[in-house]
A protein has these predicted regions:
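Active-site neighborhood of phospho(di)ester-bond hydrolases with catalytic His/Asp-centered motifs
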Residues: 48-50, 72-80, 100-103, 163-166, ...
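Active-site metal-binding motif and surrounding structural segment of the metallo-beta-lactamase
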Residues: 43, 54-101
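A short, aliphatic-rich alpha-helical micro-motif
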Residues: 69, 157, 297-301
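Conserved beta-strand hairpin/beta-sheet module of binuclear metal-dependent hydrolase folds
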Residues: 3-65, 154-157, 161-165, 265
Length: 360
Protein backbone atom coordinates (compact mmCIF):
# COMPACT_ATOMS: atom_id res chain seq x y z
CA UNK A 1 0.00 0.00 0.00
CA UNK A 2 1.82 3.06 -1.29
CA UNK A 3 1.36 6.73 -0.54
CA UNK A 4 -0.01 8.78 -3.44
CA UNK A 5 1.79 12.04 -4.22
CA UNK A 6 -0.98 14.54 -4.98
CA UNK A 7 1.35 17.56 -5.23
CA UNK A 8 5.11 17.86 -4.90
CA UNK A 9 6.01 16.64 -1.39
CA UNK A 10 2.32 16.30 -0.42
CA UNK A 11 0.90 12.77 -0.15
CA UNK A 12 -2.39 10.99 0.41
CA UNK A 13 -1.84 8.38 3.14
CA UNK A 14 -5.43 7.44 3.94
CA UNK A 15 -7.35 4.22 3.57
CA UNK A 16 -10.28 2.88 1.57
CA UNK A 17 -13.00 1.03 3.48
CA UNK A 18 -14.99 -1.03 0.98
CA UNK A 19 -17.06 -2.65 3.74
CA UNK A 20 -18.41 0.44 5.50
CA UNK A 21 -22.03 0.48 4.34
CA UNK A 22 -23.72 2.49 7.13
CA UNK A 23 -21.97 5.84 7.25
CA UNK A 24 -22.18 7.28 10.78
CA UNK A 25 -24.76 4.57 11.48
CA UNK A 26 -27.62 6.26 9.64
CA UNK A 27 -26.68 7.09 6.03
CA UNK A 28 -26.13 4.38 3.43
CA UNK A 29 -22.76 4.25 1.69
CA UNK A 30 -23.32 1.17 -0.50
CA UNK A 31 -19.84 1.15 -2.05
CA UNK A 32 -18.02 2.07 1.17
CA UNK A 33 -16.01 5.22 1.87
CA UNK A 34 -12.50 6.59 2.28
CA UNK A 35 -10.77 8.02 5.33
CA UNK A 36 -8.35 10.53 3.88
CA UNK A 37 -5.20 11.61 5.67
CA UNK A 38 -2.40 13.71 4.18
CA UNK A 39 1.33 14.10 4.73
CA UNK A 40 3.58 17.05 3.87
CA UNK A 41 7.29 16.31 3.60
CA UNK A 42 9.26 19.38 4.74
CA UNK A 43 11.64 20.57 7.44
CA UNK A 44 8.84 19.79 9.87
CA UNK A 45 7.20 16.67 8.48
CA UNK A 46 3.48 17.12 9.01
CA UNK A 47 0.60 14.64 9.09
CA UNK A 48 -2.86 16.12 8.58
CA UNK A 49 -5.67 14.06 10.11
CA UNK A 50 -5.68 10.32 10.76
CA UNK A 51 -8.15 7.51 10.08
CA UNK A 52 -10.92 5.43 11.65
CA UNK A 53 -10.46 2.92 14.49
CA UNK A 54 -8.64 -0.19 13.35
CA UNK A 55 -7.17 1.53 10.27
CA UNK A 56 -3.95 2.95 11.72
CA UNK A 57 -1.88 0.13 10.21
CA UNK A 58 -2.89 1.16 6.70
CA UNK A 59 -2.01 4.81 7.31
CA UNK A 60 1.36 3.94 8.86
CA UNK A 61 2.14 1.53 6.02
CA UNK A 62 1.49 4.20 3.39
CA UNK A 63 3.39 6.78 5.41
CA UNK A 64 6.30 4.35 5.67
CA UNK A 65 6.78 4.50 1.90
CA UNK A 66 7.71 8.18 2.27
CA UNK A 67 9.41 8.42 5.69
CA UNK A 68 9.64 6.46 8.89
CA UNK A 69 6.59 7.22 11.08
CA UNK A 70 8.83 8.41 13.92
CA UNK A 71 10.10 11.16 11.59
CA UNK A 72 6.73 12.93 11.73
CA UNK A 73 7.22 16.23 13.57
CA UNK A 74 3.75 17.76 13.56
CA UNK A 75 0.21 16.39 13.57
CA UNK A 76 -2.74 18.58 12.56
CA UNK A 77 -6.21 17.53 13.66
CA UNK A 78 -8.94 19.29 11.71
CA UNK A 79 -11.85 17.38 13.25
CA UNK A 80 -12.12 15.01 16.20
CA UNK A 81 -14.92 12.74 14.95
CA UNK A 82 -13.84 9.14 15.36
CA UNK A 83 -13.85 8.24 11.67
CA UNK A 84 -10.87 10.61 11.42
CA UNK A 85 -9.24 10.42 14.83
CA UNK A 86 -10.30 7.02 16.14
CA UNK A 87 -6.77 5.77 15.48
CA UNK A 88 -5.13 8.73 17.20
CA UNK A 89 -3.54 6.76 20.04
CA UNK A 90 -1.86 4.30 17.68
CA UNK A 91 -0.65 7.03 15.33
CA UNK A 92 0.75 9.19 18.14
CA UNK A 93 2.44 6.15 19.68
CA UNK A 94 4.11 5.32 16.35
CA UNK A 95 4.99 8.88 15.28
CA UNK A 96 5.65 10.62 18.60
CA UNK A 97 5.10 14.11 17.12
CA UNK A 98 6.69 17.07 18.88
CA UNK A 99 3.51 19.14 18.40
CA UNK A 100 -0.17 18.41 17.80
CA UNK A 101 -2.36 21.26 16.51
CA UNK A 102 -6.15 21.40 16.84
CA UNK A 103 -8.94 23.85 17.65
CA UNK A 104 -9.88 24.69 21.24
CA UNK A 105 -13.12 22.74 20.86
CA UNK A 106 -11.21 19.77 19.45
CA UNK A 107 -8.99 19.81 22.51
CA UNK A 108 -12.11 19.46 24.68
CA UNK A 109 -13.36 16.58 22.52
CA UNK A 110 -9.96 14.93 22.70
CA UNK A 111 -10.03 15.07 26.50
CA UNK A 112 -13.47 13.48 26.47
CA UNK A 113 -12.38 10.65 24.21
CA UNK A 114 -8.92 9.92 25.56
CA UNK A 115 -8.74 11.27 29.13
CA UNK A 116 -5.51 10.33 30.88
CA UNK A 117 -4.14 8.73 27.72
CA UNK A 118 -3.43 12.21 26.34
CA UNK A 119 -1.83 13.73 29.46
CA UNK A 120 1.63 13.68 27.83
CA UNK A 121 0.52 14.61 24.32
CA UNK A 122 2.06 17.92 23.12
CA UNK A 123 -1.26 19.46 22.08
CA UNK A 124 -1.46 23.14 21.10
CA UNK A 125 -4.85 24.77 20.49
CA UNK A 126 -5.09 27.16 17.52
CA UNK A 127 -7.69 29.65 16.31
CA UNK A 128 -8.68 31.24 13.01
CA UNK A 129 -5.76 33.10 11.42
CA UNK A 130 -3.05 31.27 13.33
CA UNK A 131 -0.28 29.99 11.10
CA UNK A 132 2.82 27.85 11.40
CA UNK A 133 5.85 27.48 9.15
CA UNK A 134 6.96 23.94 8.47
CA UNK A 135 9.79 24.94 6.09
CA UNK A 136 8.90 25.65 2.48
CA UNK A 137 5.23 25.42 3.39
CA UNK A 138 3.04 27.51 5.68
CA UNK A 139 -0.13 26.17 7.26
CA UNK A 140 -2.96 28.60 8.05
CA UNK A 141 -5.83 27.49 10.29
CA UNK A 142 -9.45 28.56 9.91
CA UNK A 143 -12.10 27.45 12.38
CA UNK A 144 -15.36 26.32 10.76
CA UNK A 145 -17.50 25.70 13.82
CA UNK A 146 -20.62 23.59 13.19
CA UNK A 147 -19.39 22.61 9.75
CA UNK A 148 -20.30 20.11 10.79
CA UNK A 149 -19.04 19.77 14.40
CA UNK A 150 -18.18 22.46 16.99
CA UNK A 151 -14.49 21.49 16.75
CA UNK A 152 -14.21 21.67 12.95
CA UNK A 153 -11.47 23.64 11.24
CA UNK A 154 -9.74 23.63 7.86
CA UNK A 155 -6.05 24.01 7.05
CA UNK A 156 -4.78 26.03 4.08
CA UNK A 157 -1.32 25.89 2.53
CA UNK A 158 -0.81 29.04 0.39
CA UNK A 159 2.43 27.85 -1.22
CA UNK A 160 0.79 24.68 -2.56
CA UNK A 161 -2.63 26.36 -3.00
CA UNK A 162 -4.31 23.41 -1.28
CA UNK A 163 -7.15 23.43 1.25
CA UNK A 164 -7.41 20.49 3.63
CA UNK A 165 -11.16 20.78 4.21
CA UNK A 166 -11.96 17.92 6.66
CA UNK A 167 -15.58 16.78 6.10
CA UNK A 168 -16.55 19.74 3.90
CA UNK A 169 -16.66 18.99 0.15
CA UNK A 170 -16.50 15.24 0.81
CA UNK A 171 -18.33 12.25 -0.62
CA UNK A 172 -18.65 8.55 0.19
CA UNK A 173 -16.74 7.05 -2.72
CA UNK A 174 -14.53 3.99 -2.34
CA UNK A 175 -12.05 3.09 -5.07
CA UNK A 176 -8.53 3.50 -6.38
CA UNK A 177 -9.18 6.92 -7.91
CA UNK A 178 -7.98 9.84 -5.81
CA UNK A 179 -9.15 12.78 -7.93
CA UNK A 180 -12.54 13.98 -9.13
CA UNK A 181 -11.37 14.13 -12.75
CA UNK A 182 -10.53 10.41 -12.64
CA UNK A 183 -14.09 9.46 -11.68
CA UNK A 184 -17.37 9.39 -13.60
CA UNK A 185 -18.62 12.96 -13.30
CA UNK A 186 -22.33 12.28 -12.82
CA UNK A 187 -21.62 9.82 -10.01
CA UNK A 188 -19.35 12.34 -8.29
CA UNK A 189 -22.09 15.00 -8.32
CA UNK A 190 -24.65 12.50 -7.04
CA UNK A 191 -22.35 11.38 -4.22
CA UNK A 192 -21.55 14.97 -3.27
CA UNK A 193 -25.27 15.75 -3.05
CA UNK A 194 -25.89 12.54 -1.09
CA UNK A 195 -23.20 13.52 1.41
CA UNK A 196 -24.36 17.11 1.75
CA UNK A 197 -28.07 16.42 2.15
CA UNK A 198 -27.55 13.61 4.66
CA UNK A 199 -24.68 15.08 6.70
CA UNK A 200 -24.16 18.81 6.16
CA UNK A 201 -27.64 20.16 5.36
CA UNK A 202 -28.61 21.31 8.90
CA UNK A 203 -25.50 23.50 8.92
CA UNK A 204 -26.25 25.32 5.66
CA UNK A 205 -26.17 28.76 7.37
CA UNK A 206 -22.61 28.00 8.50
CA UNK A 207 -21.74 26.86 4.96
CA UNK A 208 -22.94 30.18 3.53
CA UNK A 209 -20.84 32.07 6.10
CA UNK A 210 -17.75 29.99 5.34
CA UNK A 211 -17.85 29.98 1.54
CA UNK A 212 -16.77 33.64 1.14
CA UNK A 213 -13.69 32.82 3.23
CA UNK A 214 -12.97 29.82 1.01
CA UNK A 215 -13.50 31.86 -2.17
CA UNK A 216 -11.03 34.48 -0.91
CA UNK A 217 -8.23 31.91 -0.90
CA UNK A 218 -6.10 31.06 -3.93
CA UNK A 219 -7.00 27.36 -4.22
CA UNK A 220 -5.97 24.86 -6.88
CA UNK A 221 -6.88 21.78 -4.85
CA UNK A 222 -9.40 20.81 -2.15
CA UNK A 223 -8.49 17.70 -0.16
CA UNK A 224 -11.44 16.48 1.96
CA UNK A 225 -11.42 13.75 4.60
CA UNK A 226 -13.82 11.56 2.60
CA UNK A 227 -13.90 10.77 -1.09
CA UNK A 228 -12.17 12.40 -4.03
CA UNK A 229 -9.80 15.36 -4.19
CA UNK A 230 -10.92 18.32 -6.31
CA UNK A 231 -8.34 20.02 -8.52
CA UNK A 232 -8.34 22.59 -11.32
CA UNK A 233 -11.88 23.15 -12.69
CA UNK A 234 -13.51 20.83 -10.17
CA UNK A 235 -12.51 23.18 -7.31
CA UNK A 236 -14.87 25.92 -8.50
CA UNK A 237 -17.50 23.32 -9.35
CA UNK A 238 -17.68 21.83 -5.85
CA UNK A 239 -17.65 25.28 -4.19
CA UNK A 240 -20.47 26.45 -6.47
CA UNK A 241 -22.39 23.24 -5.82
CA UNK A 242 -22.11 23.77 -2.06
CA UNK A 243 -23.44 27.29 -2.41
CA UNK A 244 -26.40 26.06 -4.46
CA UNK A 245 -27.19 23.29 -2.00
CA UNK A 246 -26.82 25.58 1.02
CA UNK A 247 -29.13 28.21 -0.46
CA UNK A 248 -31.90 25.61 -0.90
CA UNK A 249 -33.67 27.64 -3.57
CA UNK A 250 -37.06 26.29 -4.69
CA UNK A 251 -36.86 23.64 -7.38
CA UNK A 252 -39.72 22.47 -9.58
CA UNK A 253 -39.71 18.81 -8.61
CA UNK A 254 -41.77 16.65 -6.25
CA UNK A 255 -40.94 13.50 -4.31
CA UNK A 256 -43.77 11.18 -3.27
CA UNK A 257 -42.98 8.69 -0.50
CA UNK A 258 -45.32 6.01 0.79
CA UNK A 259 -45.80 2.62 2.38
CA UNK A 260 -48.69 0.30 1.68
CA UNK A 261 -50.48 -2.80 2.99
CA UNK A 262 -52.67 -4.02 0.15
CA UNK A 263 -51.45 -1.68 -2.62
CA UNK A 264 -54.24 0.88 -2.18
CA UNK A 265 -51.86 3.59 -0.93
CA UNK A 266 -49.38 2.57 -3.61
CA UNK A 267 -52.03 3.17 -6.28
CA UNK A 268 -52.75 6.57 -4.75
CA UNK A 269 -49.04 7.45 -4.83
CA UNK A 270 -48.88 6.75 -8.55
CA UNK A 271 -52.08 8.74 -9.09
CA UNK A 272 -50.52 11.72 -7.29
CA UNK A 273 -47.44 11.35 -9.48
CA UNK A 274 -49.63 11.36 -12.60
CA UNK A 275 -51.22 14.59 -11.41
CA UNK A 276 -47.82 16.25 -11.16
CA UNK A 277 -46.85 14.88 -14.57
CA UNK A 278 -50.05 16.19 -16.17
CA UNK A 279 -49.19 19.64 -14.85
CA UNK A 280 -45.60 19.62 -16.08
CA UNK A 281 -43.97 19.02 -12.71
CA UNK A 282 -41.27 16.30 -12.60
CA UNK A 283 -41.97 13.82 -9.81
CA UNK A 284 -40.45 10.71 -8.26
CA UNK A 285 -42.28 7.94 -6.39
CA UNK A 286 -40.34 6.13 -3.64
CA UNK A 287 -41.44 3.29 -1.41
CA UNK A 288 -40.23 3.81 2.16
CA UNK A 289 -39.94 0.05 2.49
CA UNK A 290 -37.76 -0.33 -0.61
CA UNK A 291 -35.65 2.83 -0.22
CA UNK A 292 -33.38 3.75 2.67
CA UNK A 293 -34.23 7.11 4.25
CA UNK A 294 -30.87 8.53 3.12
CA UNK A 295 -31.81 7.71 -0.49
CA UNK A 296 -35.10 9.58 0.00
CA UNK A 297 -33.21 12.56 1.40
CA UNK A 298 -30.87 12.52 -1.59
CA UNK A 299 -33.87 12.56 -3.94
CA UNK A 300 -35.09 15.67 -2.09
CA UNK A 301 -31.84 17.44 -3.02
CA UNK A 302 -33.47 18.41 -6.31
CA UNK A 303 -37.02 18.89 -5.03
CA UNK A 304 -39.01 21.35 -2.98
CA UNK A 305 -42.26 19.40 -2.64
CA UNK A 306 -42.77 16.30 -0.50
CA UNK A 307 -45.98 14.26 -0.53
CA UNK A 308 -46.38 11.45 2.00
CA UNK A 309 -48.79 8.54 2.02
CA UNK A 310 -49.66 5.69 4.38
CA UNK A 311 -52.62 3.50 5.18
CA UNK A 312 -54.04 3.86 8.66
CA UNK A 313 -52.43 1.32 10.99
CA UNK A 314 -53.42 1.12 14.66
CA UNK A 315 -54.92 4.61 14.39
CA UNK A 316 -51.63 6.00 13.09
CA UNK A 317 -49.27 5.32 10.15
CA UNK A 318 -46.93 2.54 9.07
CA UNK A 319 -43.52 2.74 10.80
CA UNK A 320 -41.33 2.97 7.69
CA UNK A 321 -43.06 6.20 6.69
CA UNK A 322 -42.75 7.78 10.13
CA UNK A 323 -39.11 6.73 10.31
CA UNK A 324 -38.39 8.50 7.01
CA UNK A 325 -40.22 11.64 8.12
CA UNK A 326 -38.38 11.73 11.45
CA UNK A 327 -35.07 11.47 9.62
CA UNK A 328 -35.97 14.20 7.13
CA UNK A 329 -37.19 16.49 9.92
CA UNK A 330 -33.87 16.18 11.75
CA UNK A 331 -32.01 17.43 8.67
CA UNK A 332 -34.18 20.56 8.62
CA UNK A 333 -34.75 21.22 4.92
CA UNK A 334 -36.12 24.73 4.75
CA UNK A 335 -38.22 24.90 1.59
CA UNK A 336 -40.35 21.76 1.62
CA UNK A 337 -44.03 22.12 0.86
CA UNK A 338 -46.43 19.28 0.27
CA UNK A 339 -49.24 17.19 1.56
CA UNK A 340 -50.40 13.83 2.82
CA UNK A 341 -52.73 11.08 1.69
CA UNK A 342 -53.73 7.62 2.81
CA UNK A 343 -56.13 4.71 2.60
CA UNK A 344 -58.12 3.01 5.35
CA UNK A 345 -60.57 0.28 6.19
CA UNK A 346 -62.65 1.93 8.90
CA UNK A 347 -61.06 4.94 10.63
CA UNK A 348 -58.67 6.89 8.36
CA UNK A 349 -56.43 8.90 10.71
CA UNK A 350 -53.17 8.53 8.77
CA UNK A 351 -53.03 11.86 6.87
CA UNK A 352 -53.72 13.83 10.06
CA UNK A 353 -50.96 11.96 11.92
CA UNK A 354 -48.29 13.47 9.70
CA UNK A 355 -48.81 17.05 10.88
CA UNK A 356 -46.71 16.75 14.06
CA UNK A 357 -43.83 15.13 12.19
CA UNK A 358 -43.82 17.34 9.11
CA UNK A 359 -40.24 18.49 8.30
CA UNK A 360 -40.66 22.26 8.39
Amino acid sequence: MNAVEILKDIYWVGCVDYDHYDFHGYSKSPEGTTYNAYFIKDEKNTLIDTVAPGKAGTLLCRLGHVIKPEQVDYLVINHMELDHEGSLCEVISACKPEKIFCSTMALKSMAGYYGDKMKDWPVQAVKSGDKISIGKHTLVFQETRMLHWPDSMVTYCPEAKILFSQDAFGQNIAGTERFVDEHEHGDFIRRAKEYYFNIVLPYSPQVLKTLPVVRSLDIDMIAPDHGLISRNESVKEIIDLYETMAEQKPRKRAVIIYDTMWHSTEQMAYAVCSGFEDNGVPATVMSCKANHHSAIMTALSDASCLVVGSPTHNNTVLPYVMSALTYIKGLRPKILVGGAFGSYGWSGESPRCFSSSWPT
